[in-house]
Amino acid sequence: MSLISKLRELAEVKPDHEAFVFTEYDTRSGDRTSTLTWRQVYVRASNLARYLNSLNDDLERQKFAAICAPQGIEYIVGFLGALFAGWCPVPLPEPQGGLQDKRTGLALLDCSAAVVLTTAKDEDAVRATLAAYSLAVTTPVIALDTFEVADVSPSGAGDVSDFRPPEGGMYLQYTSGSTGNPRGARISLENVEINFRQIAKAAFPYKGTEVSLPRSTVSWLPLYHDMGLMVGLFIPVYCACPSYFMSPAAFVRKPIRWMRMLAERDQPFTAAPNFAFDLATSRISDADMSGIDLAHVSAISNGGERVQPNTVDSFLERFSRYGLRPEVVKPSYGMAEAVVYVAISEVGTPPVSTEFDAQSLANGHAELKGPDAEHATRLVRYHKLDADPLVRIVDPESCVELSPGGIGEIWVHGGNLSSGYHNVDNALNKEKFHATIRDKSPGTPRSPWLRTGDLGFEWDGGFYIVGRSKDLIIQDGVNHYPDDIENTVKEFTRGRVAAFSIADERSERLVIVAEVKPTGPASGSSGVELPLVKKRAMAALSRLHGLHVADFLFVPPQALPKTTSGKISRSACAKRYLSAGFEQLEVPQ
């Protein structure tokens, strides 16, 4: 059943049941909850759809409706209202200043938004963004929180049966832009339905041979992010269960809110990127967890950035005493071009990680850590390559499928894949989304394959991820993965780190930029610790990775540019470094 049909069914058979419940913390009047029932969602989206269709009678051209609103129920209404109108929703962040606004402006420019859906408090900021990117000053900007039913004319508002939106539809999901400017992947509602089925089969627990769907979802992920949209909107609709959500800032300020919300809800499913698990482990105290039981949690997906085995271990060790079962935590892999999901750890088993010889990985081939290996790299295992969607490891140059252990590009084949990027040359879309394997294994489709740009290898029936091909650092002919370098440095700096290379006329120069707190034992507050931290980190990079560091900078917290999904943007870091844009902390000599 399509997303639209499912919404209509829920509005008719569960009209007064909770659908979307948003909790806003720390308001002047305390914590505040906003709720929409299934009928209210359908009627409000229908009213907005009528109004959108009254703005323009041009049915020949695909119309894009950008949603630039804060986290909340208005975002849900805006996204669904655009779909109901037959328009193409474009989920984007609200204007907040800085690099994120640049990405929003570039996306608005790229899709030529015919309308922008926001809230009253952000209306002026949205108009300023439109003006900054020379977009039409006549572009309608609609404040969803003050939009009245009376605005719908002449049809007016009515019951569920009064409005039948088109069944098909698509939206533009802009990539996070971790290695360049964001691009809008065209995602159809058929892609979404297929991806939901793939997630349900792979991530949710089983009762016998039947999938046991979650009875609620819990999320703090932004709704403009692919994973946030899946957990906060799509899964609740397909599972006919309520969505409980908060803002990302509410979680970061007090991570315990995530655990409390999970404990309060019925068999919840949730997801978050790796850093959130670190944050929860380090910032939630035993006193915070008093009375909290996590035994009923359906599944917790760790995805959106590279999953660190140490993070998974620490999270399970920390919260297993509160009933969290190991098999519930699911390392996952995905991307916007695949709706969100590509692979996950095996069903019904705890997360698995394996130690590989670091030098072998640097040389382009995986080998298990031997007894004499000086340094090992521990990687998380993902499910078998023949699961749905299919995954293959392919030589990016020859397009030949590699044998187990060979490090190559991860290619994906399945019905959840985007048809291509919006407003991009057909040749590039063909190369990216319709790749062909020249020498393939039996049973492997020749095409079409999505080239992910990620590097990995097959091992013992599953596969492992080692990094992004665009981020690869090559020094003295040896490949180095920035995630491994950053993890080594973090052991000493205890903060976020970016490792990237700058090319000169002879070679690639490795640059490290590390965030440190202005006070504390590793921060240099006494004027002594920073030089020692730097010395130890550089010695470890030399000893464990055989790397020479050309420059090592300390910067304040939050100085490293991030993508819209919260990942460090190494390409933006490199640009800022070259323009001397980092505010460095002084390191006494």
From Swiss-Prot:
GO biological process: Actinobacterium-type cell wall biogenesis; fatty acid biosynthetic process
CDD domains linked to this entry: FAAL
Keyword flag DNA repair: no
EC number: 6.2.1.-
Biochemical pathway: Lipid metabolism; fatty acid biosynthesis
InterPro entries in the cross-refs: AMP-bd_C (IPR025110), AMP-bd_C_sf (IPR045851), AMP-binding_CS (IPR020845), AMP-dep_synth/lig_dom (IPR000873), ANL_N_sf (IPR042099), FAAL/FAAC (IPR040097)
Keyword Ligase carried by entry: yes
Record-level GO cellular component terms: plasma membrane
MF terms (GO), sorted A to Z: adenylyltransferase activity; ATP binding; ligase activity
Keywords assigned: ATP-binding, Fatty acid metabolism, Ligase, Lipid metabolism, Nucleotide-binding
Family label: Belongs to the ATP-dependent AMP-binding enzyme family.
Function: Catalyzes the activation of long-chain fatty acids as acyl-adenylates (acyl-AMP), which are then transferred to a multifunctional polyketide synthase (PKS) for further chain extension.
Protein's name according to its UniProt entry: Probable long-chain-fatty-acid--AMP ligase FadD30
